[in-house]
Amino acid sequence: MLAKRIIPCLDVGNNKVIKGIQFKDHKIVGDILELANRYAKSGADELVFYDITASPNDQVVNKRWISQIAKVINIPFCVAGGINTLKQAKQILASGADKISINSPALINPMLIQELADHLGTQCVVVSIDTWHNPQKKIYQVKCYTGDSTRAKITTWQTLDWVKKVQEYGAGEIVLNMMNQDGMKNGYDLDQLRNIRKHCQVPLIASGGAGTYQHFLEAFRDADVDGALAASVFHNQIIDIHKLKQFLNKEGIKIRLC
């Protein structure tokens, strides 16, 4: 069994780390390099950088700060933001990223997943899915362009169907961004995660809702996710990664200790 992963998430806007609640009302929380370095030294297993303003503005993530990050940290990191072509993906990997993640561009052109997987290998290709629970219809729906609340919209895809489809196209890993829980610190949506896990044969990363050590434990133990991604609790130093890993280890979760 592979060790479970603790993954700080850094949302980037205008070259600063920002954070909102339910993908809205973003505020600046710090410098990209400073936070990346802090998390790498504190025992994070990898980092994820989402340039959330790139796709809505028809731009591509800034490769300059990717190169700078690669020079100051020694753990794997994944980058997302407006990656629409194989050429762009290659440039980002050449700048030092270990993986690339696509979200809205994959919804527009699903064949992009297959093209990236065929040329770069599935291990490099992550598909990030912004999933929203519609309480009226009682279904989970996929949203796109969520980095800009004025452009965000619900797609025709239900979340489980999209999870199945991206695997067919060659996604090597799936990050499930649970929008209803994002920034709320009330725990991950375990029901949704358990259901997705039944149909997900690639590594599954939970994102959205972490507020306590127990929430991480529940995601690993009860939903069998491969990694737990969080932002607010790390940015605001509510949870210390080293102590979190010690807790998980004592609870029987296989984890890489700092």
Swiss-Prot record:
It is found in: Cytoplasm. It catalyses: 5-[(5-phospho-1-deoxy-D-ribulos-1-ylimino)methylamino]-1-(5-phospho-beta-D-ribosyl)imidazole-4-carboxamide + L-glutamine = D-erythro-1-(imidazol-4-yl)glycerol 3-phosphate + 5-amino-1-(5-phospho-beta-D-ribosyl)imidazole-4-carboxamide + L-glutamate + H(+). One of its GO terms (cellular component) is cytoplasm. Pathway: Amino-acid biosynthesis; L-histidine biosynthesis; L-histidine from 5-phospho-alpha-D-ribose 1-diphosphate: step 5/9. GO terms for molecular function: imidazoleglycerol-phosphate synthase activity; lyase activity. The active site is at D11, D130. It comes from the Bacteria. Its EC number is 4.3.2.10. Keywords: Amino-acid biosynthesis, Cytoplasm, Histidine biosynthesis, Lyase. GO terms for biological process: L-histidine biosynthetic process. Its main location: cytoplasm. IGPS catalyzes the conversion of PRFAR and glutamine to IGP, AICAR and glutamate. The HisF subunit catalyzes the cyclization activity that produces IGP and AICAR from PRFAR using the ammonia provided by the HisH subunit. Heterodimer of HisH and HisF. Belongs to the HisA/HisF family. NCBIfam families: hisF (TIGR00735). This is Imidazole glycerol phosphate synthase subunit HisF. It comes from Blochmanniella pennsylvanica (strain BPEN). The lineage of its organism: Bacteria, Pseudomonadati, Pseudomonadota, Gammaproteobacteria, Enterobacterales.
